[in-house]
């Protein structure tokens, strides 16, 4: 019995399973890179199709990487206060490199670099890490969590009939819900205008009765 054993085996050894999770998460992040630089660009950025079990297993890793990247963005903004606009290799850049301002820049940027290294240890792809920190993380700055969604596909996989699913990043391919417009009705006449008419009718009725 597999009591107290977390996760799915997926029919693989631990090393093979770890490599699978790293490749799936990197593949999801790389779908957001510049399509003009990719010969095999995805049809829909921010989306991969895999089996339902693999999607559920890799989802926590993707969420963790996005959280690390998102929390490191304030350190990058703080470091911009101390950076220089001089060209690398110029005399002005060399002077800045030896100044106290560079030390402040390096100290402010240290949490950002540390987060990049941690994510690189998790997924092992430098290009995917660059896409995550440069493109994807800014999209979720105001979102407290839940950066991905899993949608089950109706058509199973050919060969073994495995259940397929879409794992995608939220916020870009969301459906736009349209609410129906409220019907406009003619406004009823004000009570002050209808009151004199009602009094006139009652006077006519009493006069005719007499």
Curated annotation (Swiss-Prot):
Keyword Transport: no
Name of the protein described by the UniProt record: Large ribosomal subunit protein bL17
Pfam families: Ribosomal_L17 (PF01196)
Gene Ontology annotations for the cellular component aspect, listed alphabetically: cytosolic large ribosomal subunit
Alphabetical UniProt keywords: Ribonucleoprotein, Ribosomal protein
GO biological process, any: translation
Transmembrane segment boundaries: none
Gene field: rplQ
Single GO MF annotation: structural constituent of ribosome
């Amino acid at each position: 019995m597999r009591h107290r054993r977390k996760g799915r085996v997926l029919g693989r050894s631990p090393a093979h399973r770890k490599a699978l999770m790293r490749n799936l998460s990197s593949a999801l992040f790389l779908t957001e890179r510049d399509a003009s630089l990719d010969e095999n660009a995805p049809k829909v950025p921010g989306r991969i199709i895999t089996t339902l079990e693999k999607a559920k297993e890799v989802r926590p890793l993707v969420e963790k990487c996005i959280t690390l990247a998102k929390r490191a963005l304030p350190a990058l903004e703080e470091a911009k206060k101390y950076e220089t606009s001089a060209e690398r290799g110029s005399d002005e850049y060399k002077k800045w490199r030896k100044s106290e301002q560079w030390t402040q820049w390096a100290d402010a940027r240290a949490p950002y670099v540390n987060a990049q290294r941690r994510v690189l240890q998790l997924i092992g792809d430098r290009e995917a890490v660059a896409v995550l920190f440069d493109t994807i993380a800014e999209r979720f700055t105001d979102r407290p969590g839940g950066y991905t969604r899993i949608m089950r596909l109706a058509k199973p996989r050919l060969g073994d009939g495995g259940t397929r699913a879409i794992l995608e990043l939220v916020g870009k391919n969301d459906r736009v819900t349209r609410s129906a417009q409220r019907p406009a009705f003619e406004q009823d006449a004000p009570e002050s205008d209808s009151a004199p008419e009602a009094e006139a009718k009652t006077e006519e009725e009493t006069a005719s009765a007499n």
